[in-house]
Amino acid sequence: ASDVYKRQDYKDIQLSVSSARIIPSFFTMHDLSTLYSALLKLRYADLNIDWTQNATLSRIIAAEMLRGRDYLMSDNNLDSFLYAMNNKVAMTKDIPVLNLLIGNYGDEEMEATLDINSRSITNSQIIIAGATGSGKTNLLAVLIQQFRMLSTESQYPVNFLLFDYKGEFSDIQNNHWLSLFDVDRSCILDPLTQPLPFTPFKDFTGRSINEINLYSTEMSSALCSIDRVSASANMNNRLSEAIVEAYKSTNGAPISFELMLKCYQSRMKDANNDDSISSVLKQLVNAHIFESEDKVSLIDDSYIIKMDGYPKDGPIAKAIVYFLMSKLNNIYELLDKQAVNDEVVQIRHFSIIDEAHYMLDFDNRPLRNLIAVGRNKGLSIILATQNMSSFKSKGFDFYANAQYPLIMKQQTIDDKVIKDLFGVSGQELQEIRTAIAGLQKGELIIKDQMAFALGMGNKYKKINVTHLI
């Protein structure tokens, strides 16, 4: 390639915010780092590039991969490559086995693992209840590290989306944590400094008006719920109509909060006299937390959303989580079923919501939908909250839909939750209460599925969680 061509390439790579990032382990996998280094330095020999910058290196690698893609897609090059490598069957067999090693069982020094994707597992959801100081953050880190370690060097990497309510994972002081998850600081998104690079709204281009009507009703309910708005029937109808009108004006393309507010105010008697709905919409407009279009794919990479700049129970924090869960729903509706082989199914992505109790006290339909149907598309969700009773919401039983409820140290112990979760009463109930009360930092109890099925022995096991961070 000419020098001019290479210079233009590098300029494009620098300016491309949406360029794919390649995980750090890519450069050391199969001991090929020396070869990669030599090839890159030879190709870009005339440019002054700082090769120590992971973000720059990742984008250059991505550009080279795209160049390779263009070559493979021309003529019959791809078919020739697949035939030569005999790789079609190997790709399916390469689905990683996600047996997450999270610690050991009590004093037995026996490894404690969570089977996430074998074909016998009905779902892949994990819920965690642990009070402040229970070791919940470390457990989340262990789970993320295991998902990534077991998958990133395969052809089926499992990416993640973490809502960092406390700002611990995005804290520069904890920068060394990121390498444990095979990411760097470019994965951290701070909506206080820059809008999140996604539109939260669904694309209805070419779809029926009935679909928009249904969506507008759901969206109206959500906007009222995230700030506990007391909205009259007229206000709800007005908001639904405003959403439909906004979509009509974009011919079904994703709308914005600004357009929604404008359409809503046009239906108010006095647009200068805010009601509770226009007040919420103005907060969302002023916060400018989302872009008006997708600039990156939410599931094709890993992201940490820095949330500590917003009140945890405020409308902005709730809107971020709600609308990104809704976004995941929209994405997964369009995906094919995940890859499967004789032993395991593919897990594409997992979302982690810490301080999840703030998202469980209202009818969070996108979250419920993801938990209910996510397994069929290769999605896992990890919810963490401080109190075990938070997962017993009025409209949805999160315990019944979780494969692995993990109970850590509690401030208050809910007998009803224990009865439902472990199927115990009387003396067995007291034993589990005592076990929970005696948990120390970094310890948890989990239902013993075998004892539960046989109806004999202790209905729980205690796990000492690996100390990672």
Question: Locations of the language-model features?
Answer:
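Short, small-residue-biased leader/transition segments that mark boundaries at the very start
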Residues: A1-Y5
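Short, positively charged interaction helices/loops
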Residues: R7-Y44
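Phospho-regulated, low-complexity intrinsically disordered regions of nuclear gene-regulatory
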Residues: S33-A84
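Basic- and hydrophobic-enriched, low-structure N-terminal and domain-boundary segments
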Residues: L72-A131, L139, L150-E153, L454
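P-loop NTPase motor domains
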Residues: L101, D107, V142-L379, K392-K394, ...
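P-loop NTPase motor core of the ASCE superfamily
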Residues: I116, F391-I469
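Conserved lysine of the Walker
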Residues: K136
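H-loop/switch region of ABC-family ATPase nucleotide-binding domains
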Residues: T385
